[in-house]
Amino acid sequence: MIQQESYLSVADNSGAKRIQCIRVLGTNRRYAHVGDVIVAAVKDAMPNMGVKKSDVVKAVVVRTKATLRRDTGNSIRFDDNAAVIINADNNPKGTRVFGPVARELRERNFTKIVSLAPEVI
């Protein structure tokens, strides 16, 4: 579960390495899970890229360390908390996505992120 001030790694090549959650988007939401959109501040970034340190960005959570329970009874858990930075049209800013992403992103209409990901779990 991601909440305010949680740190996440960035799973794309937009230029940011780590982001800190500022707010979970939605009506009075406290926690974010896989597929939720957050507002975050860039805490660590690579030089000469599209995103700079201290930029405020929107991102979608693609992996969480908290257990994700599916309707089939399966549960899945990732090794890290990760997000992909998105623009206003919910398309990723980067051109590549690193690491596996959860299948729930397809249900939330983030099909571009799912198509860029090397593995969908």
Curated annotation (Swiss-Prot):
GO terms for biological process: translation. GO terms for cellular component: cytosolic large ribosomal subunit. It comes from the Bacteria. One of its GO terms (molecular function) is structural constituent of ribosome. Keywords: Ribonucleoprotein, Ribosomal protein, RNA-binding, rRNA-binding. Part of the 50S ribosomal subunit. Forms a cluster with proteins L3 and L19. In the 70S ribosome, L14 and L19 interact and together make contacts with the 16S rRNA in bridges B5 and B8. Belongs to the universal ribosomal protein uL14 family. PANTHER family: 50S/60S RIBOSOMAL PROTEIN L14/L23, LARGE RIBOSOMAL SUBUNIT PROTEIN UL14M. Binds to 23S rRNA. Forms part of two intersubunit bridges in the 70S ribosome. NCBIfam families: rplN_bact. This is Large ribosomal subunit protein uL14. The lineage of its organism: Bacteria, Bacillati, Cyanobacteriota, Cyanophyceae, Synechococcales.
